[in-house]
């Protein structure tokens, strides 16, 4: 029987009135009355958890339904999740909004960054049976595609959510094809029907024409008001298949996510494909061959709720007592140690591939060690970030971080500042370039400093290649000319142009990834007055005429400001950089030259004139020879100072310049 002592439950869940979610216990009174009340609360909570466990234990696997929500950014995924949690009794109506958006940055930006999960129990009034529903609230932005794909692996179907005011958008299309390719059963839902700007017939027509789904099967709801949301739960039961699983087979579990808990360490979220996981069981990793003992097992309801076990078809969490957080590799398969002989790992394990790299340095050099720990904790919670230590002559010790996209980098920086109060300097984003040598070997370069310089022949380089992406854009047809010009100015190649219903156009372009990370989306929004949407996927490498541009101050290259770009951009970008960097440098007692160099050739230059003292101030106007002598001596001194002097550039100058560059 599943029973905790009241002290254990009180310490875990706290002294708040027992609703449906555990909460953290703060300081409470130790008076006899308060102690009795706390014991009552703990007992009630314990009884409630037991009742949940008993209900789940009675539900057969054929009544399990694992599903996700497919949607564009800001189409209402998290709000719809809240309504479903309310209808199934997981949270109370009127409780805090966006329960599954737990990060501050998610609430502030109105986006989902980390895929969150929750178990629900739905009693179908049509037959009186209980159904175990497992919801995954996935990110909608393209940068977090890795979160989406691994979440779909644990699902049998998905809700295809379309905003009635905006219609089908680029990320809806991209996520649809990802879900469709993984065999998910899709239920089309038209959201935000309560708004005056809602055009329901248009949205239904787009669903039918773009996705070939019957418009008559579209459910019309308002997640904000709860209108008609009740119709979604029976549709999930009827149309999404039960997971293909076997409780009696040896254990196979897929690692869906992991995060760091300050009290218990690494927590792993697993989809149990076959078998059962129980407390005390020893697990074996298929990819790292590490062995771990299950310290705790349970479900997300929506916070952690301990259980005796989780069975095939369920998604739950375990505390494995893992000492090295890097061993938690997303997509890994876990077996029961001792019963793993002859078993094959589940498909889908793939190391995340960063698309954008930045150098990161503490604003204060003395904070490196503390910030190193903070970054390590964040990387554990977001395994798609790659981390290497690096050193800059200008900024000192730092890290080279790899991200899935520019928004991903921005969100990581914001989380670091919000959650740890850390101040960090990020260099301009760069993409991974490929250097192909004459002997047939190749090398991926993510740091501009490592990019080959002027003499490629002496370095045995055959060709240089840069990554391209297939960009999908949906825009109103009135902006088609402006968007085509934008794409061509960013070295884009048109692949497809399709007119959708009601004045929308779907455009596909092949664009260099380097152009995409330079605020391409911001420019796209600007030229379409905010009505455009964008998604993209990797299109491989292509040969390109790319060069390294160095920013030099008095001949000294500033490694933190080195960039790689296409040769056609060198003149304009070089002039812009030297003019802007000049703004942040202080006057010196000698002349300072700021130069942009490519292959040791100066392509742009700005000069900061020397500060000079008026050495002739005390002279009589008629003393010409003395005047010339003093000016000549001053000029000679300036020459010597320029030859031996070094320009001190403080961190604030780099920070201000890079802030505007990014």
Curated annotation (Swiss-Prot):
Promotes mitochondrial protein synthesis. May act as a fidelity factor of the translation reaction, by catalyzing a one-codon backward translocation of tRNAs on improperly translocated ribosomes. Binds to mitochondrial ribosomes in a GTP-dependent manner. One of its GO terms (cellular component) is mitochondrial matrix. GO terms for biological process: positive regulation of translation; translation. It comes from the Eukaryota. Belongs to the TRAFAC class translation factor GTPase superfamily. Classic translation factor GTPase family. LepA subfamily. Its EC number is 3.6.5.-. Signal peptide: none annotated. This is Translation factor GUF1, mitochondrial. Keywords: GTP-binding, Hydrolase, Membrane, Mitochondrion, Mitochondrion inner membrane, Nucleotide-binding, Protein biosynthesis, Transit peptide. Transmembrane segments: none annotated. InterPro entries: EF-4, EFG_III/V, EFG_V-like, EFTu-like_2, LepA_C_sf, LepA_CTD, LepA_IV, P-loop_NTPase. It catalyses: GTP + H2O = GDP + phosphate + H(+). Residues 1-28 form a transit peptide. It comes from Meyerozyma guilliermondii (strain ATCC 6260 / CBS 566 / DSM 6381 / JCM 1539 / NBRC 10279 / NRRL Y-324) (Yeast). It is found in: Mitochondrion inner membrane. Its main location: mitochondrion. GTP binds at residues 71-78, 137-141, 191-194. It is a peripheral membrane protein. GO terms for molecular function: GTP binding; GTPase activity; mitochondrial ribosome binding. It holds the Pfam family GTP_EFTU. Disulfide bonds: none annotated.
């Amino acid at each position: 029987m599943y029973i905790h002592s009241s002290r254990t439950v009180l310490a875990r869940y706290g002294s708040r009135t027992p609703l449906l979610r555990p909460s953290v216990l703060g300081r409470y009174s130790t008076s006899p009355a308060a102690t009795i009340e706390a014991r009552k609360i703990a007992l009630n909570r314990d009884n409630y958890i037991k009742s949940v466990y008993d209900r789940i234990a009675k539900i057969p696997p054929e009544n399990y339904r694992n599903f996700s929500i497919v949607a564009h950014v800001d189409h209402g995924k998290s709000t719809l999740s809240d309504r479903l949690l309310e209808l199934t009794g997981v949270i109370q109506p009127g409780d805090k909004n966006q329960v599954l958006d737990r990060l501050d940055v998610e609430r502030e930006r109105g986006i989902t960054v980390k895929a969150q999960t929750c178990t629900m129990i739905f009693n179908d009034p049509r037959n009186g049976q209980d159904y175990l529903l497992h919801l995954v609230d996935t990110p909608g932005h393209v940068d977090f595609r890795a979160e989406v794909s691994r979440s779909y692996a644990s699902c049998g179907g998905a809700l295809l959510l379309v905003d009635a005011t905006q219609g089908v958008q680029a990320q809806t299309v991209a996520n649809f094809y990802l879900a469709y390719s993984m065999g998910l059963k899709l239920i089309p839902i038209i959201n935000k029907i309560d708004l005056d700007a809602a055009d329901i017939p248009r949205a239904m027509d787009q669903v039918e024409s773009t996705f070939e789904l019957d418009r008559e099967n579209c459910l019309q709801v308002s997640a904000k008001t709860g209108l008609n949301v009740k119709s979604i739960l029976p549709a999930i039961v009827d149309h999404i298949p039960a997971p293909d699983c076997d409780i009696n087979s040896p254990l196979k579990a897929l690692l869906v996510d992991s995060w760091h808990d300050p009290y218990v360490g690494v927590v792993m979220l697993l989809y149990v494909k076959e078998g059962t996981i129980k407390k005390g069981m020893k697990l074996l990793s298929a990819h790292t061959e590490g062995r771990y003992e299950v310290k705790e097992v349970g479900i997300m309801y929506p916070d952690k709720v301990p259980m005796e076990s989780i069975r095939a078809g369920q998604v739950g969490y375990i505390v494995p007592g893992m000492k090295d957080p890097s061993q938690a590799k997303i997509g890994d398969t876990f077996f029961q140690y001792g019963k793993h002989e002859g078993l094959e790992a589940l498909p889908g394990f793939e190391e995340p591939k960063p698309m954008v790299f930045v150098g990161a340095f503490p604003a204060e050099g003395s904070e490196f060690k503390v910030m190193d720990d903070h970054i390590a904790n964040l990387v554990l919670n977001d395994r798609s970030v790659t981390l290497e230590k690096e050193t800059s002559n200008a900024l000192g010790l730092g890290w080279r971080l790899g991200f899935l996209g520019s928004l991903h980098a921005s969100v990581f920086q914001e989380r670091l500042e919000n959650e740890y109060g850390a101040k960090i300097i990020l260099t301009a984003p760069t993409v991974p370039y490929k250097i192909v040598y004459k002997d047939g070997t190749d090398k991926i370069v993510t740091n501009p400093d490592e990019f080959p310089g002027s003499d490629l022949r002496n370095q045995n380089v055959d060709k240089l290649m840069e990554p391209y992406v297939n960009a999908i854009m949906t825009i109103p047809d009135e902006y088609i000319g402006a968007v085509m010009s934008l794409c061509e100015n960013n070295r884009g190649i048109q692949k497809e142009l399709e007119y959708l219903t009601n004045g929308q156009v779907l455009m596909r372009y092949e664009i260099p990834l380097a152009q995409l990370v330079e605020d391409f989306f911001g420019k796209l929004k600007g030229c379409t007055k905010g009505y455009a949407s964008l998604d993209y996927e990797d299109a491989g490498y292509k040969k390109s005429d790319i060069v390294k541009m160095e920013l030099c101050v008095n001949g000294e290259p500033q490694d933190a400001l080195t960039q790689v770009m296409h040769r056609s951009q060198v003149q304009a970008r070089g002039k812009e950089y030297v003019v802007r960097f000049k703004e942040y440098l202080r006057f010196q007692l000698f002349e300072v030259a700021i130069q942009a160099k490519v292959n040791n050739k100066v392509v742009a230059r700005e000069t900061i004139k020397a500060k000079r003292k008026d050495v002739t101030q005390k002279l009589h106007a008629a003393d010409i020879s003395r005047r010339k002598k003093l000016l000549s001596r001053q000029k000679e001194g300036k020459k010597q100072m320029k030859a031996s002097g070094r320009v001190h550039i403080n961190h604030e100058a780099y920070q201000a310049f890079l802030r505007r560059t990014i």
